[in-house]
Structures are given as C-alpha cells and as structure tokens.
C-alpha cells in the first residue's frame, strides 16, 4: 500500500445509485445526491486515497450513460479518479470486500 500523510492510501470503489445518490431505478436524471456521503467521498479523495465510481447504468439497456453521469457527478461536486461503467446487473452481490452502504461509517 502506498503512503499518504503517514497513512496507508487505499483504493475505494463506490457504487453510485443508492449509495451516493437516491436510487431511481433507471430514471437517472431524477437522482438526488446524498450530500453527506459525497462529502465523505471527497474527504477520502482529498486525503490522497484513490476513489473509483462503479455503476451498472446502461448494463441492461445498452444505453451509454457516461456523459450524463459525468455531468451529474460534476454538478454534485463529486471528486473521483475513475468512473467505471459496466457493473453487472444483479439483485445480490456476494463479495469479500463489500460493505453495505447503509452500514458504512459515513
């Protein structure tokens, strides 16, 4: 792990819908940001950690949501290093590094 200010720099990967904004189930233009969560993401970025955003937007429809999502994130003031589209659509994710967004220490 790299060091930032004497601390380990980590790579954080955040989902978008239902994590840093409301889940609108495909009506992404209506999503509303969770300001306190975005502030936390930005603090991690400012502390030297790598912030990646990972979304399933367009996975099932084939619609390219990159430009709209980038514009939306900029409007919300989200700081990040990489936006990754193509997250598989699933009802349940089982992952050894996953943390439920409702349980995360925002």
Each language-model region and where it sits:
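Catalytic phosphate/metal-binding cores of nucleic-acid and nucleotide-processing enzymes, i.e., regions
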Residues: 1-106
């Amino acid at each position: 792990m790299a060091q930032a200010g004497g601390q380990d720099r980590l790579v954080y990967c955040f989902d978008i819908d239902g994590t840093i904004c409301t889940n609108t189930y495909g009506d992404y233009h209506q999503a509303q940001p969770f300001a306190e969560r975005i502030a936390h993401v930005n603090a991690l970025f400012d502390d030297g950690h790598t912030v990646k955003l990972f979304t399933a937007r367009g996975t099932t429809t084939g619609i390219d949501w990159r430009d709209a999502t980038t514009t939306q994130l900029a409007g919300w003031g989200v700081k990040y290093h990489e936006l990754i589209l193509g997250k598989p659509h699933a009802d349940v994710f089982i992952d050894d590094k996953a943390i439920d967004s409702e349980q995360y220490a925002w």
